[in-house]
Curated annotation (Swiss-Prot):
Catalysed conversion reaction: tRNA(His) + L-histidine + ATP = L-histidyl-tRNA(His) + AMP + diphosphate + H(+)
GO-annotated cellular components: cytoplasm
Species of origin: Orientia tsutsugamushi (strain Boryong)
Subcellular location per the Swiss-Prot or TrEMBL entry: Cytoplasm
Keyword annotations: Aminoacyl-tRNA synthetase, ATP-binding, Cytoplasm, Ligase, Nucleotide-binding, Protein biosynthesis
UniProt enzyme class: ligase
PANTHER family per the UniProt record, alphabetical: HISTIDINE--TRNA LIGASE, MITOCHONDRIAL-RELATED, HISTIDYL-TRNA SYNTHETASE
Pfam families reported for this sequence: HGTP_anticodon, tRNA-synt_His
The protein's name: Histidine--tRNA ligase
């Protein structure tokens, strides 16, 4: 009986070239985040399900349709993380990090899981970069997180392929008034709304604005705008965020229907979107989530009522679809001892070159011609031969595989030669 060798639907093997793209995206993001004062953090892929039940919103597609939920052997409900923010906030509360010097700035990356229909740029197992700034409630913090996202996209040469859409969901008072207006508006179209939107009408009408159903979108196009329901404070906050973005030269479009897909957002929400990757147009998105800490049971020693926070995540697969980056293969040096008696000397040289950060392999089997063929196959730049003459003269015969030229280099000059002549 044969076994299934293909990956589980919605997952895929990351082969070297694509892995190189992912690694580059993560490296660029991590390095830029360091310049902004972010530190690395890692949380488990698996969490107790209640972490997400309390944070994502029961009306969200993620919680109602897309979660990977299991009972473990102890009959505990656990889930594969569908996103990072709730896990990061859990880690903050569990490790009592909120009482350290604020703000906390964290960078993380890794896989997440959603039981969704696989398509370009979205698998059921996907990968994200994730950045969270916890403890800063200023408008500049919002602008700075958008600016960091912009800098990452710029470094990846993607700023010309995306557009920034931004909105404000206002404060709690703003949202309460706006939600009532939405209920009154959408109630007139109740029977025309999709089944999902009908169920959200009372619980969370904001989520109807995020519906992917085309008919829902047509109805939402004429819905009241949240901008008409801001308190003076909420409007002033959003205006200040936009002022900072303009000062930093960041172009944006205000999208009044942008609400993001999770319930913990408030005030600023934003997305960088592209028209080049099909239906999954959002490549990066985030926003402010000031109430999440308290919602998860967090308490501040200072007695303050709220721990403000803002962050964003970007899908690595989607960024990889857009970027033109091609991983540069490091071309190795191949050591070929011509006879077995020179194997030990070859191994000593192998370790020496690796200790000096020169990518090197050694080939000890088969004829010289077969070993040369293998060296060409792995795109080696040079071959170092070790034989009787070389041992006697304390030298190495080196063949350049691009030109087929050969030269002889004495032992103590080999390192400088390779460092100056290897691609």
């Amino acid at each position: 009986m044969s076994i299934k060798l293909q990956p589980v639907k919605g997952s895929k093997d990351l082969l070297p070239e694509e892995f190189g793209k992912h690694d580059y995206i993560i490296s660029v993001s991590r390095n830029l985040s360091k310049l902004y004062g972010f530190q690395p953090i890692s949380t488990p892929i698996i969490e107790y399900t209640e972490i997400f039940n309390r944070t994502l919103g029961k009306d969200s597609d993620v919680l109602s349709k897309e979660m990977y939920v299991f009972l473990d052997k102890g009959n505990r409900s656990v889930s594969l993380r569908p996103e990072f923010t709730a896990s990061i906030m859990r880690a903050v509360i569990y490790n009592n990090l909120q009482n350290k010097k604020l703000p906390l700035k964290y960078f993380s990356s890794g896989p997440a899981f959603r039981y969704d229909n696989p398509q370009a740029g979205r698998q059921r197992q996907f990968h994200q970069i994730n950045l969270e700034c916890i403890g800063d409630g200023s408008p500049f913090s919002d602008a700075e997180i958008v600016l960091l996202a912009y800098d990452i996209l710029k470094k990846l040469n993607l700023v010309d392929k995306v557009n920034l859409e931004i909105n404000s969901l206002g404060c709690m008072e703003s949202r309460a008034k706006y939600q009532q207006a939405l209920v009154e508006y959408f109630s007139k179209y109740r029977t025309e709304l999709s089944q999902d939107s009908q169920s959200r009408l009372i619980e969370n009408p904001l989520r109807i604005l995020d519906s992917k159903n085309l008919h829902d979108k047509k109805i939402s196009a004429s819905a009241p705008s949240i901008h008409d329901y801001y308190t003076i404070e909420a409007r002033g906050y959003f205006d200040k965020v936009l002022e900072y973005l303009e000062f930093c030269g960041i172009k944006y479009t205000i999208n009044a229907n942008l609400v993001r897909g999770l319930d913990y957002y408030c005030h600023t929400v934003f997305e960088y979107v592209s028209t080049q990757i099909g239906a999954q147009s959002t490549v990066l998105g985030g926003g402010r989530y000031d109430g999440l800490f308290e919602q998860m049971g967090g308490k501040l020693a200072s007695g303050k009522k709220m721990l403000p926070a803002i962050g964003f995540a970007a899908g690595i697969e989607r960024l990889a679809l857009l970027t033109n980056y091609t991983p540069v293969d490091v071309r190795p040096i191949v050591i070929i001892p011509v006879d077995e008696e020179y194997h030990q000397h070859g191994i000593i040289l192998l370790q020496k070159l690796r200790n000096n950060n020169i990518t090197t392999v050694i080939d000890l089997q088969d004829s010289i011609s077969k070993r040369l063929n293998r060296a060409n196959h792995i795109k080696a730049s040079k071959v170092i031969f070790i034989g009787a003459i070389e041992m006697r003269e304390q030298s190495y015969r080196i063949k350049d595989l691009d030109t087929s030229n050969e030269c002889v280099i004495i032992h103590n000059e080999l390192l400088s030669y390779l460092q100056n002549n290897c691609s």
